[in-house]
């Protein structure tokens, strides 16, 4: 009996995949594709037309993961599900419909170049080899075990179009070899080496902007990566646009500044290293395809001309970022990161300034001490004045959720709602700190921003008031987004690092877990493990988290507009007990260890006695970070032990300073 397949396919590779399945004797029960985008140049074959010629049922749903489609696919009882250049991720319920496996064909040699547009990216980066990979599908994009690969060499003259042709041939060869073996159950997968993984996001036309300060070879690679049928690399000549379709790199730039015309026939431009000869291009989006020499005449370029637009000649205005809660953990680290380059002016408000004293002398840092519930006129004025608003003020410690639930609601929801409405009023971009807490008691193995259910406990468990306050604001912001509000929601997962909070906060129970544990070590009291400390969390170094947040603020090509992004480290999962044990190990080895009492042991306590009757806990909280990888090219890299060490060192030095002050 022929194996039955359901296929998700688009592009030439989609056609190749379908033809290979038919050639291998597979029964294709249904095909899912995309309707062509009228704004996109469709230089590739049509999956829908191929299906029509073969009488194969074809569909183009907006959401293939909708339960109705999953139910229909499940009824087809496919042995296999295949994805060939289909542009949407397929969820676990859909993948589970395949009795023998779900496989994807990806256009690179995985684990390198996961994500979008791998053929373009390998050219941009000057690679000499790529390939195609058939791999098992898992929830995380392009991360499943590898079934088969075929290598493709990249020549120095390849363009995106010629490389695509090579990949198409390689895909046909790979599938013709592997599909019969797959049907016989003779192929298995090899896990990917995560240490070699790289991930790239989608490319947009704006990514084709030519920066003449770069080496000529790098610009040549960019041009061939995005030349026709893609939108092309471009630069400005005065107020006009020059699209470069063909070029070559040469050594030497005659000592000229980047962007200077060295000669007009051939049209040769000085680069940061070497020079670029423009062989062909066009003027504007609707111009004729012209030689470089004719382009020089059309633009009036002569030796010594500068390819700089009028905007580049003006000093760029810094982006004005308003941070409410600037003295807090995220606020002070974020300010420090943004002030490291000269693109931002930071305006901040908070009720204290101890964590930002080191920043107050910076010329681009502007601080006022104030309360967001009182200084509303200052806040409204600065929202109107600034470009980006981050309302970071919140009560975010679990004991306060049960101890002061109304105060949590008033501050975390009501005061922040006012700020959101000011952003709507003045059409300002808001980057709102949602929270991993919104996932509540979700049972997914990892929490996905777009598909995971947000589940909380009964009303008498006041612990959830923080979660639902944040969730409701997420929903309000999303609704305003449908009316034009520019926004991004980010969800931090257990960020840790220096200046997390204060030992004094831990003394009254109002601090994060690691600060409580360190306080016990400092004071020689037993480390209290709530419900045995079996709860697992994924801890994220603040430096990793802030880098992701900085990229969200940068928002290159609008990639983060209207998005929800988890920022966490799924590889740094540990139970609270394991966190305490690692803290103890590093504490005993720390140079300051001799200044503190002996370790008093671990003590298990019941959660209601520690937090109160309104508390309820969750067993795990692990983020999916596919959105962060694909939208902002972010992957965390700092191991948990390093983060624990930095955090411990900060608090031990704080404790020593307290002792010195008491003398």
UniProtKB/Swiss-Prot annotation:
Site feature location: Transition state stabilizer: 104
Active site, renumbered: 106 (proton donor), 437 (proton acceptor), 621 (proton donor)
Keyword field: Antibiotic resistance, Lipid A biosynthesis, Lipid biosynthesis, Lipid metabolism, Lipopolysaccharide biosynthesis, Multifunctional enzyme, NAD, Oxidoreductase, Transferase
Site feature location: Raises pKa of active site His: 142
EC number of this enzyme: 2.1.2.13, 1.1.1.305
Source species: Pseudomonas savastanoi pv. phaseolicola (strain 1448A / Race 6) (Pseudomonas syringae pv. phaseolicola (strain 1448A / Race 6))
Membrane-spanning segments: none
Reactions this protein catalyses: UDP-alpha-D-glucuronate + NAD(+) = UDP-beta-L-threo-pentopyranos-4-ulose + CO2 + NADH; UDP-4-amino-4-deoxy-beta-L-arabinose + (6R)-10-formyltetrahydrofolate = UDP-4-deoxy-4-formamido-beta-L-arabinose + (6S)-5,6,7,8-tetrahydrofolate + H(+)
GO biological process: lipid A biosynthetic process; lipopolysaccharide biosynthetic process; response to antibiotic
Pfam families referenced in this protein's UniProt entry, alphabetically: Epimerase, Formyl_trans_C, Formyl_trans_N
Function: Bifunctional enzyme that catalyzes the oxidative decarboxylation of UDP-glucuronic acid (UDP-GlcUA) to UDP-4-keto-arabinose (UDP-Ara4O) and the addition of a formyl group to UDP-4-amino-4-deoxy-L-arabinose (UDP-L-Ara4N) to form UDP-L-4-formamido-arabinose (UDP-L-Ara4FN). The modified arabinose is attached to lipid A and is required for resistance to polymyxin and cationic antimicrobial peptides.
The UniProt record lists the keyword Transferase: yes
GO (cellular component) term, any one: membrane
Renumbered residue ranges of the record's region Formyltransferase ArnAFT: 1-307
Quaternary state and interactors: Homohexamer, formed by a dimer of trimers.
Entry coiled-coil feature ranges: none
Residues noted as binding UDP-alpha-D-glucuronate in the record, renumbered to the chain: 396, 401, 435-436, 463, 494, 528-537, 615
The organism's place on the tree of life at top rank: Bacteria
The family this protein is said to belong to: In the N-terminal section; belongs to the Fmt family. UDP-L-Ara4N formyltransferase subfamily.
Name of this protein: Bifunctional polymyxin resistance protein ArnA
Residues bound to (6R)-10-formyltetrahydrofolate: 116, 138-142
InterPro entries (alphabetical): Arna-like_SDR_e, Bifun_polymyxin_resist_ArnA, Epimerase_deHydtase, Formyl_trans_C, Formyl_transf_N, Formyl_transf_N_sf, Formyl_transferase-like_C_sf, Lipid_A_modif_metabolic_enz
């Amino acid at each position: 009996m022929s194996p039955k397949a359901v296929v998700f396919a688009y592009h030439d590779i989609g056609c190749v995949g379908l033809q290979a399945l038919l050639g291998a004797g597979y029964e294709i029960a249904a095909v899912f594709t995309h309707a062509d985008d009228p704004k996109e140049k469709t230089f590739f074959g049509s999956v829908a037309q191929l299906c029509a010629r073969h009488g194969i049922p074809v569909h183009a749903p907006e959401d293939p993961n909708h339960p109705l489609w999953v139910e229909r696919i499940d009824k087809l009882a496919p042995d296999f599900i295949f994805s060939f250049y289909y542009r949407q991720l397929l969820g676990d319920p859909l993948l589970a419909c395949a009795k023998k496996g779900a496989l994807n064909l990806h256009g690179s040699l995985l684990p390198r170049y996961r994500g979008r547009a791998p053929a373009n990216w390998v050219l941009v980066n000057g690679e000499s080899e790529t390939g195609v990979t058939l791999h098992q599908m898992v929830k995380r994009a392009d991360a499943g075990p590898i079934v088969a690969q075929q290598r493709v060499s990249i020549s120095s003259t390849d363009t995106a179009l010629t490389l695509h042709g090579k990949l198409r041939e390689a895909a046909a060869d790979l599938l013709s070899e592997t599909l019969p073996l797959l049907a016989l159950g003779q192929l298995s997968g090899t896990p990917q080496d995560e240490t070699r993984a790289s991930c790239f996001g989608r490319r947009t036309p704006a990514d084709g902007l030519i920066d003449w300060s770069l080496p000529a070879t790098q610009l040549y690679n960019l041009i061939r990566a995005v030349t026709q049928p893609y939108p092309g690399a471009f630069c400005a000549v005065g107020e006009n646009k020059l699209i470069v379709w063909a070029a070559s790199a040469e050594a030497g730039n005659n000592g000229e500044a980047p962007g200077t015309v060295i000669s007009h026939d051939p049209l040769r431009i000085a680069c940061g290293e070497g020079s670029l000869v423009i062989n062909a291009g066009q003027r504007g989006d609707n111009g004729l395809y012209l030689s470089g020499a004719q382009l020089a005449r059309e633009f009036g370029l002569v030796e010594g001309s500068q390819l700089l637009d009028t905007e580049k000649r003006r000093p760029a205005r810094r982006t004005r970022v308003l941070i409410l809660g600037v003295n807090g953990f995220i606020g002070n680290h974020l300010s420090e990161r943004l002030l490291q380059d000269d693109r931002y002016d930071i305006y901040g408000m908070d009720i204290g300034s101890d964590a930002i004293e080191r920043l107050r002398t910076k010329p681009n840092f502007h601080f006022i001490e104030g309360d967001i519930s009182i200084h509303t006129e200052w806040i409204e004025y600065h929202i109107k004045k600034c470009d980006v608003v981050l309302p970071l003020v919140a009560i975010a410690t679990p004991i306060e959720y049960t101890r002061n639930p109304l105060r949590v609601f008033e501050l975390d929801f009501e005061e922040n709602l006012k700020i959101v409405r000011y952003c709507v009023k003045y059409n300002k971009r808001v980057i709102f700190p949602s929270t991993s807490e919104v996932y509540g008691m979700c049972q997914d193995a990892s929490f996905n921003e777009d598909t995971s259910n947000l589940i909380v406990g009964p009303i008498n468990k006041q612990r959830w008031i923080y979660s639902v306050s944040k969730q409701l604001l997420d929903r309000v912001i999303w609704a305003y987004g449908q009316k034009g509000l520019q926004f991004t929601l980010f969800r931090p997962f257990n960020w840790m690092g220096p200046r997390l909070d204060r030992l004094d906060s831990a003394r009254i129970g109002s601090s994060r877990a690691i600060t409580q544990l360190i306080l016990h070590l400092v004071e020689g009291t037993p480390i209290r493990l709530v419900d045995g400390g079996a709860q697992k969390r994924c801890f994220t170094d603040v430096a990793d988290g802030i880098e992701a947040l900085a990229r969200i603020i940068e928002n290159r090509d609008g990639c983060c507009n209207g998005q929800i992004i988890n920022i966490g480290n799924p590889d740094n999962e540990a139970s609270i007990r394991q966190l305490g044990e690692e803290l103890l190990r590093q504490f005993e080895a720390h140079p300051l260890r001799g200044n503190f009492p002996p370790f008093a042991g671990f003590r298990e306590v019941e959660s209601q006695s520690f937090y109160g009757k309104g508390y309820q806990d969750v067993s795990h909280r692990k983020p999916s970070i596919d959105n962060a990888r694909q939208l902002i090219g972010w992957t965390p890299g700092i191991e948990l032990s390093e983060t624990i060490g930095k955090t411990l060192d900060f608090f031990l030095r704080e404790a020593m300073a307290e002792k010195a002050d008491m003398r």
